[in-house]
Amino acid sequence: MAKRETSYELWLREEGIPVIGGFGVEDVTELPLKPWKRTGGRGAYIDLKGMEGFTGMYVGEIPPGGALQPENHLYEELIYIIAGYGATEIWSPGDNGRRMHFEWQQGSLFAIPLNTRHRLINGSREPVFFLAVTSAPLMIDLLHNVPFVMSSEYKFSDRFDAESDYFVPTNTRKEVGGFINWETNFIADARGALVDPSEAKGYGVKITSFDMGGSTLVGHIAEWPVGRYHKAHFHQGGAILLILRSKGYTLMWPPEAGIRPYQSDHADQVVKVDWREGSVFSPPSGWFHQHFNTGNEKARQLAFRYSGQSGKYLLGAWRAINKEGVRTSVREGGTMIEYEDEDPQIRADFEAAINRVGVPGSAGSK
């Protein structure tokens, strides 16, 4: 029987630009972008196996010296600038007199507040490339009325009311649910932003969650040393991981393969995703996944996800399978595999990988 399409999937097809699938994309800057009538630029949608109708993603291009068409929509959106510099003009529906303007550059990350009118402007003589993650699948599938989603005049003044300092970078960080959470609507350069120690996930690992635009769509920035790797864990689908620095690989495997997939003769179920700067991938619901740095510099990853524990506004559906949390061992009811419990083949393969490229490292040990 042919698979039926959701309202969101039908909309993607009607948009007239490529839709890229699979477990991951090695370099989003190399995708085949096509002219995009609705936005006035070029673009491609990315709909990976692990996104599962929770999150949407696309890559957009703004022509040199040009701008995209103004738009507003009833879904949340986070934008990361891959290349170029420019500005965003933003205002509430029906409030043209109070337009705000803020500038961005390569590495900038910001939220588009819910249902605000906005326009992205290229300030350079080269194309601007950006990656956007949205909650469009949830909203379009629930309402199945795209014109309403894209043309509502409702003003969410609790999210945005043209505050003069709305997009001024802040460094407000608080511990929320055991995580350091950064409350800001704009990060000038996510590639160099300060991240906080989080060694429960691995030796030398640093992770800082961020909360933008009053959204349930949030994320975190993770960094870990040369020659090291994260502990494996799982969570709900929909999380999207973008590599900002270094190179390496990620292993992903389904829950039925167990915590030691090689020992239990399930090696054929382990998916390996090689990554470098510009790679993006998404682990499916309940799949263990583990990140390995084989490069000669600290790895840095930008994650987009819903707020299950760390953010101000939580999405219950996203934390449904997270049990006691991604930083708690499976032995204690969580979803994380401690180094001593992992499949020995995993460390052996990693040590062989870093030895082949001459990268010093100590794998998961101190």
Residue ranges and their predicted role:
Residues 63-64, 102-125, 130-136, 272-295, ...:
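Conserved metal-binding segment of the jelly-roll/cupin
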Residues 1-53, 145-220, 336-366:
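A short, N-terminal "cap"/entry segment at the start of jelly-roll beta-barrel domains
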Residues 2-7, 11-15, 239-241, 252-365:
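C-terminal functional regions that serve as terminal interaction/effector modules
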Residues 46-49, 67-73, 101-102, 121-122, ...:
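Short histidine-centered beta-strand/loop micro-motifs
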Residues 67, 72, 76-106, 116, ...:
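A short beta-strand-loop-beta hairpin characteristic of the jelly-roll/cupin
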Residues 138-144, 309-314:
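A short beta-to-alpha transition loop/helix N-cap that caps and shapes the active-site region
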